C-alpha cells in the first residue's frame, strides 16, 4: 500500500506538468475576438504573397510544399508563443535568388542558404548567445532597425500601389492605370477603407452615455459597428474574387491534390554558393529583425507573454533545418508581420494558428495550382495591406522621446535604409558607445536608452 501511495505521489507532478502544458496551449490558442483574429491573420499577406509568388515564378519554388510547411510552422508557433507570431520569407535570400540566374542560384542554393542560416540561429539560441546579444543591444538601436524595416515595407507598398509589378524579375514595369480591376483607384479605395475601419490603430475605450449625449452615443454605436468590420479579410476576399474575374480560365487550371514532396539534392557547389551568397547577407537580418526586433515588439504589444530570444532563435532554426530539405521556402519570424497582424486585430496565437490551418488545407487540396490565382491577385490590394503593416511597425519607435534616444535611432535608421540592416546596426551601436563615453561623468548626462534586455 505504501509503495502504491508513493508511486501515486511521484506520478502527481507528471500529471500536473501535462495539465499545465495543456492549459497553456489552450490559453495561447483562445481567440480574444473571433472576427478580429480572423481579420488579423490577413495582416501578414502583403509581405508573404509577393515573395512566395516571385520565387514560384522565377525559380520554380514548390508552392504546395511551401504552403504545407509554413502552415505547420504557423500552427506550432501560435500554440507555443500565444501571440500572432508571423512566419515570413527570408527576404535577403529571396532577393538574391530573384536577381540571379537559375544556374547561379537556384532551388538547391536557396535551400542550402536556408539550412545554413537556420543551423546557425539554432546554435546561437541553444547556446544562450542569442539571449546575450538581445540583452546588450541598446533599445534605440532596436528601434532604429524597426523604423527602417517599417519604412522599407511602407515604401515597397507605395511602389506596389503606384507601379505595375513583375514579381518574377522583382521590378516595376510601368505606371499603374487609374481604372481597372487592378487600378490605382481600387488600391486607394482599399487604403481609405482600412483607415475608415481601423483608424490610427489605437485601442478605443467604450464611452459611457450621459444625459444629453444621445446623439454622441448614437454615433459611438455606429463607430463601434464600423470598427468591428474585418477590413483586411474583406479586402483579401475581394482580391480573390477579382483574380477570378481577371482570368476566368483559372478555374480550369486548378488541380486537386498536394504536390509530391521530395528531398532536395544539394551539391557541394550549391552549399558553398548558398552560404556565401545567401546565408552571409541573411544572417544579420535574421538576428536583428527575426529575433531581436520581434521579441522587443512582442514585449511592447503583449507584456504579459514571456518568451526568450533564445527560444525564438531556436524555432526559426528548426523550421529551416526541417522544411528546406523538402523544398519549402526559407522562413523566419518578422517584426513587420507581427505589427501587421496586430494592426488588423490579431491578439493571440489562435490568429496565426488559423492562418496555418488555412495554408495547410490549401497546400493539401490545391497544391501548386494555387499559383494561377496568386498570379492574378491585384497587386495594388496587396500594397494596401503591406502599407499599414509597415506603418504599424515604424510606429513602435514613437517611445524614443528624448534627443539622445532619437539621435541614435534616426542615425541607425538612415544608415540601414541607405545600405542594409547589418551596417545600420553596427553604426547605431558605435554611435551609442561614443555618446556614452562623451557623456560619462556628467551630473546630468543626456538621455541614452536603456538596454533592450531590461525589458525582456
Curated annotation (Swiss-Prot):
GO terms for molecular function: molybdate ion transmembrane transporter activity. Belongs to the SLC26A/SulP transporter (TC 2.A.53) family. The amino-acid substitution Asp-429 to Val observed in cv. Landsberg erecta may decrease the molybdate transport activity. A 54-bp deletion in the promoter of MOT1 is strongly associated with the decreased expression of the gene and the resulting low molybdate content observed in several cultivars. Not inhibited by sulfate. GO terms for biological process: molybdate ion transport. It comes from the Eukaryota. It is a multi-pass membrane protein. Its main location: membrane. The chain crosses the membrane at residues 67-87, 110-130, 133-153, 177-197, 225-245, 309-329, 354-374, 377-397, 417-437. Pfam families: MFS_MOT1 (PF16983). GO terms for cellular component: mitochondrial membrane; mitochondrion; plant-type vacuole. Strongly expressed in roots. Detected in the vascular tissues of hypocotyls, in petioles and vascular tissues of cotyledons and leaves, in mesophyll cells, stamen, sepals and siliques. Disruption phenotype: 90% and 80% reduction in molybdate content in shoots and roots respectively. Reduced growth of roots and shoots under conditions of limited molybdate supply. 9-fold reduction in molybdate content in leaf vacuoles. Decreased nitrate reductase activity due to a reduced molybdate uptake. Keywords: Cell membrane, Membrane, Mitochondrion, Molybdenum, Transmembrane, Transmembrane helix, Transport. This is Molybdate transporter 1. It is found in: Cell membrane; Endomembrane system; Mitochondrion membrane. High affinity molybdate transporter. Unable to transport sulfate.
